[in-house]
């Protein structure tokens, strides 16, 4: 399944343009003057569980492996719930064809027309000012990681890459529908297009790199680092570099959470739980478990 097509986090940023960097320095939601929905928060506590919406097919954050849902966001959902004295009730879902605003509608503030959802909170939501303004029905807050695209390449075949032109004549790859694919296809004024191979999944593109089928691949840093761990490959043999492209956000993008707009007490509780995980080192350990270096948002 195509995570970037279905999730659209990376694809969303193809259309986004340059985000406001200053906003992300203060991305946490400010609650001054708000009237928390204590009654709804009490219902959650009485139920004993926190319903958490997670994307399907988004390794290393959330994916079904051997019939078990696993990944960074899965572990984070469990840790947040435990910190709040609750158990996690996972609601995995496929992304809506209408994009991430449709995902927020289905999984946070309204529910799917087939009766699935809404959850109490959704993870892996881009914390971006323009996106927040477009989705007033939800609170988007608590960034916990910064993601971005990198170019991983085979050092035995390419000595150094500092610009797209350095890939001339080399077979490259990326995931279908991703911003990384668009960057390669448009890089060097389109001169690389004939050598770009498109794969159904980022993992497949990375395996093609490791096997020698291609010489370089454009994926997210988390996908790259996780693949190094699971495939037992060396970063010295397969290093990464960051290339500038009009279709890639220059500083990557922050990912956080979303709750329904009137659930401010819940958002406060989640913010506090996340901070506790950060201070104890548990958040970093969760990422490290999957081979991913957490990047401050």
Language-model segments: which ranges?
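Bacterial N-terminal signal peptides
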Residues: 17-32
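A ligand-binding cleft/hinge motif common to bilobed small-molecule-binding domains
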Residues: 123-134, 183-187, 210-211, 215-249
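Extracytoplasmic small-molecule ligand-binding "clamshell" domains
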Residues: 42-119
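Acidic, polar ligand-binding/catalytic clefts
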Residues: 90-165
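N-terminal secretory signal peptides that target proteins for export/translocation
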Residues: 1-16
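Extended ligand-binding regions for polar small-molecule ligands
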Residues: 74-83, 155-158, 165, 170-171, ...
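Bilobed "Venus flytrap"/periplasmic-binding protein-like clamshell domains
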Residues: 69-83, 150-200, 222
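Periplasmic-binding protein-like
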Residues: 56, 145-150, 232-271, 291-297
């Amino acid at each position: 399944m195509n995570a970037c097509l279905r999730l659209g986090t990376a694809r969303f940023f193809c259309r986004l343009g340059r985000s406001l960097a200053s906003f992300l320095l203060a991305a946490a939601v400010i609650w001054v003057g708000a009237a928390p929905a204590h009654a709804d928060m009490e219902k959650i506590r009485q139920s004993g569980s926190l319903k958490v919406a997670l994307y399907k097919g988004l390794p290393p954050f959330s994916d079904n492996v051997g019939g078990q849902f696993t990944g960074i966001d899965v572990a984070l959902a469990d840790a947040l719930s435990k910190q709040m004295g609750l158990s996690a009730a996972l609601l995995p879902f496929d992304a809506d064809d209408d994009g991430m605003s449709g995902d927020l509608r289905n999984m946070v503030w309204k529910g799917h027309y087939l009766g699935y959802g809404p959850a109490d909170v959704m993870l892996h939501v881009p914390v971006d000012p323009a996106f927040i303004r477009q989705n007033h029905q939800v609170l988007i807050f608590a960034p916990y990681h910064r993601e971005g695209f990198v170019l991983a390449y085979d050092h035995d075949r390419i000595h150094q890459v500092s610009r797209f032109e350095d890939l001339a004549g080399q077979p490259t790859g990326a995931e279908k529908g991703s911003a990384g694919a668009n960057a390669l296809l448009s890089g060097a004024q389109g001169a690389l297009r004939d050598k770009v191979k498109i794969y159904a999944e980022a993992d497949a593109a990375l395996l093609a790199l490791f096997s020698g089928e291609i010489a370089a691949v454009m994926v997210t840093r988390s996908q790259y680092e996780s693949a190094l761990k699971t495939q037992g490959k060396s970063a010295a043999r397969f290093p990464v570099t960051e290339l500038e492209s009009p279709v890639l956000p220059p500083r990557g993008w922050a990912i956080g959470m979303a709750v329904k707009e009137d659930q401010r007490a819940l958002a406060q509780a989640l913010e506090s739980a996340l901070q506790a995980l950060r201070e104890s080192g548990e958040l970093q350990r969760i990422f490290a478990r999957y081979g991913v270096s957490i990047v401050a948002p």
